[in-house]
Amino acid sequence: MLHQQSDLVDLTELARARAELGAAYLRILSYFKEDGVKSIHEIEEAMRTRNATALVRPAHTLKGESAQFCAHRLSALAETIEMTARRCVEMHETPDELIETVVALRPCFSETIALLDRDANPLAARRPGGFGRRVAAPQASFGRAG
């Protein structure tokens, strides 16, 4: 499938987009996270009910928002869902062929968000501990040598 060959996120394009958005980047990223969770929930629910029509809008939304963050693999998955669902609506078919693609959507979204979060705040990816933080010491039992 095409989406499996796509990069998760094109970091070069993302750096360009991030520079253009400036201070608004983090706010827009938080909207993407919220909207993405809603879209995936709607897609999964539409798939459970085998409703091709209900797949189109959230897949279209997720496709566009993913593309804005250069998340090509997620955008390709969403595009596959959207286009197949549109065809199913036109042909009066159920979207059963999309089951594997829909199942792959949530893990891809989670992986994408983790990468975008690391990119947005590289300090958060550091190990806990260090200056200003307590480092958990090994628990020693009272009166016993370590």
Where in the sequence are the language-model features?
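Glycine-centered helix-coil hinge/cap
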Residues: 21-23
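Amphipathic, coiled-coil-like alpha-helical segments
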Residues: 1-9, 25-33, 39, 65-80, ...
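Solenoid-repeat scaffolds in large eukaryotic assemblies
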Residues: 54-55, 74
